Regions:
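Conserved alpha/beta-hydrolase catalytic His-Asp/Glu region
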Residues: 173-227, 232
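Flexible "cap/lid" loop of the alpha/beta hydrolase fold
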Residues: 133, 140-174
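Conserved serine/cysteine hydrolase catalytic core
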Residues: 207-262, 271
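Active-site loop/oxyanion-hole signature of alpha/beta-hydrolase fold enzymes
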Residues: 67, 77-119, 289
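Conserved HGGG/HGGXW glycine-rich cap/lid loop of the alpha/beta-hydrolase fold
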Residues: 38-88
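Catalytic histidine-centered segment of alpha/beta-hydrolase-like enzymes
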Residues: 275-284
Length: 297
């Protein structure tokens, strides 16, 4: 294994072999390149037009999908949302779904206009839902992972332990070492594989000139981008699957029932066992099978 102190000098794709092993993929890895479109950065997987678009959650980045994309084996586009990964930060700190959807729509229109499926987790799920309502031609089918418009309210009601890794977004921003950053991450998600979390921190952090480490994502200052999201649901006509983590507190049964009752395109809700909020991190292979089933129709 590569030592922690050597990570800062690595290419962002240097650990993909670990993701492939986790996904059970032994064949040659597909091509993957970083693409920049104005303020938005993304990962383009494969040489053909993307069949699946992936939007990550708050405090994450496009690499959160690496294992899932490798397991799925299809051309894909994974986008860094504004203020995350290698995408630009907003001066107002509003990273809500409304402005996010406006920012990623032209990127999807250019790079993945014919995608069959959009997959969004948490903040990415709300962004995808907003995109489906405002730019329906870009969202032929939707999978929302562990989120409904009530998720911001649920977030306010949770303890630090119930939030899991999401709690890190509200915590310290600078660390003396990569190891210190990894330690707080492991403490927030003790059920997760340490190597998987190590990759996650590698992709979600950067070393500063003074040798300390910090997160790649900006501080959330919210704005009004999370308001009125339930008002969009009656206009959600794209076929939609809701995936829930069985151990998550971000979506309760009442939220799921209300979403299914209100969204015209609602197809099914699937609960993933032994998973918290981040299904792609906790149970990536189970998510791969769900996405394959959705794509088959």
């Amino acid at each position: 294994m590569i030592a922690d102190d050597a990570l800062a000098g690595l290419d962002e794709f240097a650990l993909l072999s670990e993701n492939a092993a986790q996904a059970g993929v032994s064949s040659a890895l597909p091509s993957v390149v970083r693409v920049e479109r104005g303020p938005i950065s993304a990962l383009r997987w494969g040489s053909d037009s993307a069949r699946v678009i992936f939007l990550h959650g708050g405090g994450q980045n496009a690499h959160t999908w690496d294992t899932v994309i490798l397991g799925l084996g299809l051309p894909a586009l994974a986008i860094d949302l504004p203020g995350h990964g290698r995408s630009a930060w907003r001066e107002d700190g509003d990273y809500g779904p409304k402005l996010n959807a406006e920012a990623v729509a032209p990127v999807i229109e250019e790079l993945a206009p014919d995608a069959q499926l959009v997959v969004g987790m948490s903040l990415g799920g709300l962004t995808a839902m907003r995109l489906a309502v405002t730019t329906p031609a870009l969202v032929r089918e939707l999978v929302m992972i562990d989120v409904t418009p009530s998720a911001p309210e649920r977030h306010e009601q949770m303890t630090q332990t119930q939030m899991g890794l999401v709690s890190l977004v509200q915590g310290d921003r600078e660390f003396q070492s990569f190891a210190a950053m990894l330690d707080v991450t492991v403490a927030a998600a003790p059920h997760r594989d340490r190597n998987s979390l190590r990759r996650g921190v590698f992709h979600n952090s950067k070393q500063l000139d003074d040798g300390t480490w910090t997160w790649r994502y900006d501080t959330f200052r919210k704005g009004d981008g999370f308001e009125g999201l339930w008002d969009d649901v009656p206009a959600l006509v794209a076929p939609t699957t809701l995936v829930r983590g069985a151990n998550s507190f971000f979506v309760n049964d009442d939220d799921a029932l209300e979403f299914g009752r209100t969204a015209p395109g609602f197809q099914q809700a699937i609960v993933v066992r032994d998973s918290g909020h981040s299904v792609q991190g906790d149970q990536p292979l189970a998510l791969v099978e769900i996405l394959r089933s959705v794509l088959k129709g």
